[in-house]
Amino acid sequence: MRIAAIYDVHGNLPALEAVLEEIRKEGVSQLVVGGDVVPGPLPKETLACLLGLHVATEFIYGNGEVALLDQLSGRDPSAVPEQYRPIIRWTAQQLSDQGHLFASWPKTYSVAIPGLGHVLFCHATPRNENEVFTRLTAEDRLLPIFAGLDRQVVVCGHTHMQFDRRIGSTRVVNAGSVGMPFGEPGADWLLLDEDGIRLRHTSYDLKEAADRIRQSGYPAADEFVARSLSNPPAEKEMLEAFSHAELK
């Protein structure tokens, strides 16, 4: 069994297409999509791409899908910072008749992989799609969440930075982000099989991607191109930023 895990695509279809091409070459038997497929610049096209794949695909939801479902149902997306709400509203308009496509996605997905054991996929933590932790978060803050899971491996995303660490007896691996990576341009994802877990990075044509994103009508297109394609924030900068929001 070989599984690819992709997280935090955020409507960046060009990045997704490049990663999927790499995944096809790997001959995976299953794809796990770990939430925050949307919001982003090309939400409708990104959803259609993932839902039309000819490989067994499991989806889980992230905080992005929760915010969009709140917006589509008329509920106040209270967990969304004010500066991001125009993006949520715009994405919801693009997906006004498609909320049902992701409304049934579960919070977690589990599978047994020979050589790795039981693997749990979640968006942020197994209990919550919004919680923040990084490779530097103190283990004692995280043990109450990961102890007693009866899973050898947990795969997560949410913070857009790859890592591979131990929390108690559990191996916890962050897949990074396909569409909005921090650290360097490109797209991050995971490959899991009996030989282990590999952090993968895929390059793609950033100029062509920028042109498509700018033509999408996305209200934050220039900022997205600058911060998610051309010049992503450095890992050091984001670790410092997340240190103020991480689990205490």
List each model region and its residues:
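Active-site-proximal loop/helix segment associated with metal-binding centers of metalloenzymes
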Residues: P81-R89, L116, A124-T137, A210-R212, ...
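Acidic, His/Gly-rich catalytic cores of divalent-metal-dependent hydrolytic chemistry
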Residues: R166-K248
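Core catalytic region of metal-dependent phosphoesterases/phosphodiesterases
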Residues: R2-Q93
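Beta-strand-turn-beta hairpins that frame and shape the catalytic cleft
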Residues: M1-A4, S110-L120, I167-R171
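Active-site environment of divalent metal-dependent phosphoester hydrolases
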Residues: H10-A15, P39-P41, G64-L69, V153-R166, ...
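Anionic-ligand binding region
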Residues: L136-V178
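Active-site neighborhood of divalent metal-dependent phosphoester bond hydrolases
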Residues: L53-A112, G117-H118, R135-D150, P219
